[in-house]
Design a protein with these regions (language model features):
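Alpha-amylase-like alpha-glycosidases and glucanotransferases acting on alpha-linked glucans and related
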Residues: 1-118
């Protein structure tokens, strides 16, 4: 369905997709994946009620720009985008295994990169 194109869905693992696509954990604890009952799961880095948007979707980007334009036209002084570093996800193509939580945790984050800290 077109509305699903706005979010990050993946097929579950296991015979019938009963297992989440990866072992990723939510910032709030528990799995970062929520099942929808058809073998598919959606990603939420925070609460299940806050599904992550797919910023590769032209509709998501257009809606975001429309929202910014709406408020800019009303004279707001600026915008605060919470957790901006976590908006876009560079996921591998569907069918490619996702990295494990341990592999993700080993990556530099929060602006701490060995090259930049020299």
């Amino acid at each position: 369905p077109p509305e699903r194109d706005r979010y990050l869905f993946r097929d579950g693992r296991g015979e019938n997709g009963e297992l989440p696509p990866s072992d990723w954990t939510s910032i709030f604890g528990g799995s970062a994946w929520e099942p929808v009952g058809d073998g598919q799961w959606y990603l939420h880095n925070f609460a299940p009620e806050q599904p992550d948007l797919d910023w590769n979707s032209p509709d998501v980007r257009a809606d975001f720009l429309d929202t910014l334009r709406f408020w800019a036209d009303r004279g707001v002084d600026g915008f605060r985008v919470d957790v901006a570093h976590g908006l876009a996800k560079d996921l591998p193509p569907e069918g490619t295994p996702l990295p494990t939580q341990a592999e993700l945790d080993a990556l530099p984050h929060d602006g701490q990169h060995p090259l930049w800290d020299r």
